[in-house]
Regions:
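Small-residue-biased structural context
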Residues: 1-168
Length: 168
């Protein structure tokens, strides 16, 4: 028996597209940090960075990590100020879910701040690169679980929404 495919919903599609970008960019930054920490040849690091449309290994690794963190912060701020208040009004039964997602946002925000701090102080030393790998690994564990939970939890309500919620 074939399962019916869920109808296309632009809000859910956008959420998944943004989450896909966040996953992809986080994985790229993390892989570059691991490669640098493991002493990968500069050419390999440059090649990975070029895929992120940048140049200059450690400087650009730092820049990409910081930019990724800012993107996630902005995405979560948009959810906290626009999407989540709309869902609270439209689906009061989802209050506990929204509370959990906002608590996750606070944890992820702290982890993003840690990654940013380590990235800003990134030096051409094994210890410095290892700290970035550790920070990105911890962020990955929490952020990827959060993204998966959020998509599953919000899909039913997003499928009922016709337009993007306004912020505020």
């Amino acid at each position: 028996m074939k399962r019916a495919q869920a109808p296309h919903n632009p809000l859910l599609a956008e959420l998944k597209a943004v989450h896909g970008m966040l996953r992809r960019d986080l994985a790229a930054c993390r892989q570059l940090a691991i490669a640098a920490a493991n002493g990968a040849p500069t050419a390999q690091i440059r090649s990975g960075i070029k895929q992120l449309q940048t140049r200059g290994p450690l400087l650009q690794l730092r820049s990409n990590c910081i930019r990724h963190c800012h993107t996630v912060h902005a995405h979560h701020e948009g959810e906290d100020t626009g999407l989540f208040p709309t869902i609270r009004r439209a689906a009061p039964h989802m209050r506990a879910t929204i509370d959990r997602l906002q608590a996750d946002h606070r944890v992820v925000s702290d982890l993003l701040d840690q990654v940013e701090g380590v990235a800003r102080n990134l030096q051409n030393t094994g210890d410095s690169r290892a700290r970035l790998v550790d920070a990105l690994t911890t962020l990955s564990t929490h952020l990827l679980a959060h993204l998966d939970f959020e998509e599953k939890a919000l899909a039913p309500i997003l499928l009922t929404m016709k337009a993007r919620p306004a912020n505020g």
